[in-house]
């Protein structure tokens, strides 16, 4: 297995938007000092220090001579891949050791974003080990004995991390869950309690699960720093009463480029009426996304079962829409925020939001108009399946389906 390393620091902000983390190679001893054999890093040394707001919180120590198997058990021994085991050394024992551990693992995954599994060692009697295993953030290696004296080897899995395993509540990429917003109540539930509901509207006539309440307009619902772009991305439930939100939305919809795809050009009254219909519709939520606080575009996420699209793709399209499957739409409004990498970051984040807000969501679909320039971009930058062209009442579209397992395995979170 090829391990990526870097000789420079990597800095990012946490989902709270204020805390800054830096991971960088350990500093070499000053020329005037005589480094010891234990502290002098060689050219191949890949120990890394993790800083939170310029304070050292942990060090990842690696011994290239100690390797363990990272291929799953079904792989033949002669084909199995191995990687060096890293050891996390926390700078001090504090009540927030678990939080610092998660931050250090976050930094490690951004540093080695092309890996699927990272082996680490941790003392078996440590509360940190209990945190890692019980939350699913790490799993004991099935190839190493659990030695209670010498510690055990744990495997960090990329897909578990980005699904939110072990994430501190205050640092989740998902910033709002109304069903768990009452302090002291309901936070133990991993998902909104399932109960039947019914929708009859237009082309829709279906039973479906009752959906949780949406956060209040203006609420940040998702937040993540995008390393490749060097900016922080936020998804906010659009607030039509906020002049900044509304003027940006109206300007985008009235532009020639956006109108070609969305066909929603019109006076302010039309835009206000549309956003109000979105606000009161329990199956959909309108979002405005911002780069470093600057409005950049618009999106919609919704529950697919009770969406108008569902009845037109339920046959001969190669998909089954489940009770908790979702769908999304994306509109990049500002010209300066266009481009493949930014689109990939926004699209990945919107899909990430969908999968995080309900772990029972197994699929997120999209149906852009077939002739839009974003169609090949979607096919290129998202690990989703292009199913077929479908005829909807208002457009001829391309049906895309993104599966949960593939997203967390192949999604680009860097």
Curated annotation (Swiss-Prot):
Metabolic or biological pathway, per its Swiss-Prot or TrEMBL entry: Siderophore biosynthesis
Top-level lineage group: Eukaryota
Catalytic residues as annotated in Swiss-Prot or TrEMBL: 367
Any one Gene Ontology BP term: siderophore biosynthetic process
EC number(s) per entry: 2.3.-.-
GO molecular function terms noted in the UniProt entry: N-acyltransferase activity
Biased composition regions of type Polar residues, renumbered to the chain: 16-25
Nucleotide-binding is among the record's keywords: no
TM region positions: none
Region feature (Disordered): 16-47
Enzyme class: transferase
SMART domains: AlcB
Keywords per UniProt: Acyltransferase, Transferase, Virulence
Binding of substrate, residues: 329
Pfam families: Acetyltransf_8
Function: Acyltransferase; part of the gene cluster 14 that mediates the biosynthesis of a ferrichrome A-like siderophore which may contribute to organismal virulence. The first step of siderophore biosynthesis is performed by the HMG-CoA synthase (HMGS) MYCGRDRAFT_54740 which catalyzes the generation of HMG-CoA and CoA using acetoacetyl-CoA and acetyl-CoA as substrates. The enoyl-CoA isomerase/hydratase MYCGRDRAFT_76805 then catalyzes the conversion of HMG-CoA to methylglutaconyl-CoA.
Family: Belongs to the lysine N-acyltransferase mbtK family.
Stated name of the protein: Acyltransferase MYCGRDRAFT_85486
Lineage, top ranks: Eukaryota, Fungi, Dikarya, Ascomycota, Pezizomycotina
């Amino acid at each position: 297995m090829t391990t990526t390393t870097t000789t420079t620091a990597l800095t990012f902000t946490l989902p709270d938007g204020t805390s800054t983390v830096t991971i960088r190679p350990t500093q070499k001893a000053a020329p005037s000092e005589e480094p010891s054999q234990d502290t002098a890093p060689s050219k191949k040394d890949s120990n890394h220090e993790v800083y939170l707001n310029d304070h050292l919180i942990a060090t990842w120590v690696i011994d290239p001579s100690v390797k363990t198997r990272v291929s799953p058990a079904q792989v033949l021994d002669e084909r199995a891949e191995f990687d060096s085991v890293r050891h996390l050394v926390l700078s001090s024992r504090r009540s927030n050791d678990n939080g610092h551990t998660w931050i250090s693992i976050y930094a490690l995954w951004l540093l080695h974003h092309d890996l699927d599994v990272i082996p680490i060692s941790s003392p078996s009697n440590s509360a940190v080990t209990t945190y890692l295993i019980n939350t699913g953030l790490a799993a004991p290696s099935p190839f190493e004995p659990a030695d209670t004296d010498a510690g055990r080897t744990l495997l960090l899995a990329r897909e578990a991390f980005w699904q939110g395993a072990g994430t501190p509540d205050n640092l989740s990429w998902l910033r709002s869950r109304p069903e768990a917003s009452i302090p002291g109540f309901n936070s133990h539930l991993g998902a909104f309690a399932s109960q039947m509901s019914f929708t009859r509207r237009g082309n829709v006539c279906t039973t479906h699960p009752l959906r949780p309440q949406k956060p209040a307009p203006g609420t940040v619902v998702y937040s993540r720093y995008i390393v490749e772009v060097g900016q922080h991305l936020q998804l906010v439930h659009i607030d039509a009463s906020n002049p900044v939100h509304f003027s940006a939305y109206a300007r985008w919809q009235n532009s020639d480029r956006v109108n070609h795809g969305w066909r929603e050009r019109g006076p302010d009254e039309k835009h206000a009426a549309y956003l109000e219909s979105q606000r009161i519709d329990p199956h959909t939520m309108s979002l405005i996304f911002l780069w470093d606080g600057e409005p950049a575009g618009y999106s919609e996420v919704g529950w697919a079962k009770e969406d108008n699209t569902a009845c037109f793709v339920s046959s001969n399209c190669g998909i089954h829409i489940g009770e908790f499957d979702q769908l999304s739409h994306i509109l990049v409004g500002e010209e300066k925020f266009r481009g493949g990498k930014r689109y990939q970051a926004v699209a990945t984040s919107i899909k990430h939001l969908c999968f995080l807000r309900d772990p029972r969501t197994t699929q997120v679909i999209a149906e852009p108009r077939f002739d839009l320039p974003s169609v090949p971009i979607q096919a290129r930058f998202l690990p989703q399946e292009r199913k077929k062209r479908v005829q909807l009442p208002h457009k001829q579209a391309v049906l895309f389906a993104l599966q949960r397992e593939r997203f967390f395995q192949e999604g680009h979170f860097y």
